[in-house]
Structure formats: C-alpha cells, structure tokens
C-alpha cells in the first residue's frame, strides 16, 4: 500500500511540469493528453510550503534580479521609453524575464495573487513596447548592441547560433502560460506577431532561410502556440525546424553540441548540450504527437 501511495504521489508531482490549461485549447490535443496541473492539488507538509515559498520569495527575487541587471531596461530602451546603453553579456538575456513570467503564470494558475498579476502586466507592457512593427523582438539587435555582435552579427537572423529563435521560443512559452493562467492576450498577441514573422522568414520556400533553429526550444513553443491558437502554420513551422535539423540545406551546419550533426530521423543517440537536447527532443515529441507522424 505504501508503495502505491508513493507512486501516486510522485506521479502527481510530475504533472506539475505539464502545461497549464486554465483556458481550453482551440484545437483538439494529441491522442495522448496531459492532465492539467491545475487539477492536481497538493496539501502535504513537504511540497506545499515550498510552492508557497516559490510564490512569495523566489519569483519576486528573480524579478528583482531582472530589475537590478538591466533586463527590463533593455526592453524599455528598445521601445523608446528610456535612453541608455544595452546591458548584459549575452544575446539571450531577454529570456530571463520570459522564463520568470512563465513560472509566475504557473503560480497564478495555482493560486491567484493580485500583486503578481499586476506586476506581470507592467513587465508585459515593456516587452510589447520593445517589439518592432513587423513583430521582431530581440533587444540587443534592436538596441544595436555591437558589443555583442559576436553572438548576432550586424543584422537580424545573420548567425544561426544568434539565439534569436531561442528568445522567440521562450517568449511563446511565457505567452501561452500567461494566457492560460489569466485569459489575457497582452503577451500572447506579442508572441503571435513574432511567430508570424518567423513563419515568413524561415521555411522551405524561395527567399526564405533554410536553417534549423540553432538553439532549440522554438519547436516545442510553436507546438504550444498551435494548440492555443489553432493556427496550423505554427505546427507546420515547428515540424520544419525539427526536420531541417542536421540537413545543412543552406550550407549551415552546427555540431553534435547542437544536435545538428545528422537529420533528426537518423539520430539514435542523445548527444551534445543537455539543455538543447532536452528542448529539441521535447519538440520532436510534440510534433510527433500532434501530427501523428509515425516516422518519428
């Protein structure tokens, strides 16, 4: 009996990592459906206090670090709301606020917090202001931070490993989580506008860029965006990035470090950077489930 209780308990914990679904999907999900973690309630003496500490201490602390280290200022500068020099050492610093918004949204889905909800609104206002008219959103590029040109080059989408699509992926993840938790479209609309641009720039067509994502996550994020919006082009784009992996169509080829050493259907061993691998293969699983493509 004890063994069964332990198995059930850890199974319940595992569900917390799955998508929040406060709002219904527009499209039917894959044949295998996750249980929304909002349907799992913990009332124990171990996890419950830690989840509360996450809400009251960890999330506010993480946002304060963003304030202190200029993460929000970079969006404000890009949006013309303030003057100043771009701060930070990496082209993917924009993802720090996105990741925290995602986590904070999961927290809101479990326990509503009026102050946190309002704070997210203020941060999202900065992010929306930084988005360029055509949907582009990577602050170090918009702010022309050539100090970081080793990452991104001199213009948009110049380098496959620029992390621009990585930034987009985390934006979509945050936007979907926020929409599901609050029903607000403020960040979702930013994500959709960016994703529409990505679908124009990348793909198999003439004049498009025929490259993989460089640093995976946009694959699984596009799959989530598809499930929320019902727009099939996002799933198609996710599948394109998965299948362009390892092909080197435009002469771009990364290494095993980026799981770009061979086409995805030829890969039979997990190699390279663990985070990249986790994101890529999760995206492959999402695409396989949603398309029911048995080749995967």
Predicted regions and their residues:
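Glycan-recognition and catalytic cores of secretory/periplasmic carbohydrate-active enzymes
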Residues: 25-296
């Amino acid at each position: 009996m004890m063994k069964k209780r332990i198995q059930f308990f850890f199974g319940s914990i595992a569900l917390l990592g799955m998508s929040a679904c406060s709002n219904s999907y527009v499209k039917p999900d894959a044949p295998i459906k996750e249980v929304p973690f909002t349907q799992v309630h913990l009332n124990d003496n171990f996890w419950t206090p830690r989840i509360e500490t996450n809400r009251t201490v960890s999330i506010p602390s993480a946002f304060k670090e963003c304030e202190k280290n200029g993460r929000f200022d970079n969006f404000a500068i890009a949006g013309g709301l303030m003057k100043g020099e771009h701060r930070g050492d990496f082209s993917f610093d924009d993802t720090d606020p996105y990741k925290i918004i995602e986590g904070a949204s999961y927290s809101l889905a479990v326990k509503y917090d009026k102050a946190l909800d309002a704070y997210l609104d203020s941060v999202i206002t900065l992010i929306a202001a930084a988005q360029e008219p055509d949907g582009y959103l990577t602050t170090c590029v918009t702010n022309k931070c050539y100090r970081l040109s080793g990452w991104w080059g001199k213009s948009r989408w110049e380098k496959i490993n620029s992390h621009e699509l990585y930034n987009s992926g985390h934006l979509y993840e945050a936007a979907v989580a926020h929409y599901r938790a609050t029903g607000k479209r403020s960040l979702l609309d930013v994500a959709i506008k960016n994703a529409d641009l990505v679908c124009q720039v990348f793909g198999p067509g003439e004049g498009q860029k025929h490259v993989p994502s460089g640093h995976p996550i946009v694959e699984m994020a596009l799959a989530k965006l598809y499930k929320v919006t019902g727009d099939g082009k996002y799933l198609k784009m996710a599948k394109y990035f998965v299948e362009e992996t390892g092909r080197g169509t435009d002469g771009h080829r990364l290494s095993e470090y980026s799981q770009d050493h061979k086409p995805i259907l030829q890969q039979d061993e997990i190699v390279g950077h663990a985070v990249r691998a986790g994101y890529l293969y999760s995206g492959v699983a999402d695409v396989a489930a949603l398309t029911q493509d048995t080749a995967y």
